[in-house]
A protein has these predicted regions:
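Transmembrane helix-loop-helix hairpins at the membrane interface
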Residues: 1-144
Length: 145
């Protein structure tokens, strides 16, 4: 499948998984697919381990809900250490879906994800799709037909 297809597919699934949340919107799911799907996927691609992606996701949710007390992906939050109230257009605040459904988060998190993807490419960690890979020798050392 290759790196880029795997990243795109998992980002779409990550965004779609948030459609079941209360207060979810299609724009919110697309925003999450872009920002978090790319950023968290890039975390994995850079380290080839899930721990960084899990840590970034957990830190995002903790800071958003546990510190600022704001909505997390449309699920509400409870009380944080600080009572933050975002006012303004939903496009800038994310509305009831939370700040991750805002254009601000999309731009900042996608930019961070793209920066990490550039590092992935620079380090030679991109795997091409199977139809673009050179044929490999079989177990007996011969080339496949």
């Amino acid at each position: 499948m290759g790196t880029w297809w795997a990243l795109a597919i998992t980002a779409v699934f990550f965004g779609a998984a948030h459609l079941g949340n209360p207060q979810a919107t299609v724009f919110g799911a697309v925003a999450i697919a872009l920002e978090a799907g790319i950023l968290l996927g890039a975390c994995y691609l850079l380290t080839r381990r899930l721990w960084l992606a899990i840590g970034v996701h957990a830190a995002w949710n903790f800071v958003q809900g546990g510190i600022f007390g704001s909505d997390i992906s449309g699920t509400g939050s409870g009380r944080g250490l600080i009572e933050a109230r975002f006012t303004g257009p939903d496009l800038l605040t994310g509305g009831a879906m939370g700040i991750e459904a805002s254009v601000v988060a999309v731009v900042l998190c996608t930019a961070a994800g793209v920066a990490m993807l550039l590092a992935v490419r620079r380090r030679g960690l991109v795997v091409p799709p199977c139809w673009r890979r050179p044929p490999q020798a079989t177990l007996d050392g011969t080339q496949p037909a």
